[in-house]
Curated annotation (Swiss-Prot):
It comes from the Eukaryota. It is found in: Secreted. Signal peptide: none annotated. This is Alpha-amylase inhibitor helianthamide.
Length: 44
């Protein structure tokens, strides 16, 4: 199940999910995610 893509900042985007994996960061409160978390990984 994949959700909407969510944009964090330049060069970093994630996927809206109900819960994030252990190696992912989570950003809450993004409108595009409709109450879910935006799960993303930073490239560094």
């Amino acid at each position: 199940e994949s959700g909407n893509s969510c944009y964090i900042y330049h060069g970093v985007s994630g996927i809206c999910k109900a819960s994030c994996a252990e190696d992912e960061k989570a950003m809450a409160g993004m409108g595009v995610c409709e109450g879910h978390l935006c799960c993303y990984k930073t490239p560094w």
